[in-house]
Amino acid sequence: MQQQSAHEAAQAVVNSIYRLSPGDKDSPLIIDVSRSGTRYPPEFLPPASFRALHTKISPYVDRIVLPSVAEGATVLMAEFPPTLVDPNRPVDDLDPDCLDAEWPSVLKPLQASLASGSGLVHTLGSDYTPLYQGKLSVTDVERRISDYYRPYHHALSELLAKKREKFGRAFQLSCHSMSSIGPKDGVPRPPICLGDLDGMTAPTSYVDLVARVFRGQGFEVAFNKPFRGNELLRRHASQAKRIYSLQVEMRRDLYLDEATRELNAGLATLQKCFLEIAALIRTAPPA
């Protein structure tokens, strides 16, 4: 893991649900990393191979963003993997056919989640092989929600509320990585994709600031395609309350070899981007 500052090492909160690394300086910026966790709970023992499980995460995104604590960003990272339960999915985005009994409330699985097996609880690996041989128990899925999903969202909500109270505004960057080629359509993806639910979760000035930094390092930036954002933006953003949220998807080959997952020199370039973004947000005058 990226070496921590003395302040971060002293103040970091680590448990089975999340790692919270406070910024070294006062800032309204929260960076959340929800899909890079590698702490597999002992009770999570699907029959799928470790590779099938592990290739569903956004690898090393914490390494990319952690240096930004030096410029005041607070980093919240989920310790658990998204294959256990995915914080970036609505709680009703669950395939009823994967359950051993009727769910106690109405489910509304998204078609894209059904096709990819990547809803609230992932059922397919990155190669579309099943992660489970049988049905999931309703009790087990409810426990994943209560023990992991809800506490992560609660922690993020509290952090944003405190920043909003202190600064009059709060900024959320929800950070992920994506494969360089779309697994279904085979279409090459842009280096960086910024999602704001098509303008719903962030003002243009915030989106432009982030895009400008990435472009300054030579990266092409796309907006809302192939990813426009999901539950982490929908649940926490409120422009009326001045809580501004933006999803950042980074193409994995920018910082690692996708076959071996070995990091490359591009890691430092992306770290520099987040340091600059954090510095600009920390020093920006209130809008």
Describe the residue ranges of each PLM region.
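N-terminal catalytic or cofactor-binding beta/alpha core of small enzyme domains
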Residues: 2-172, 177-287
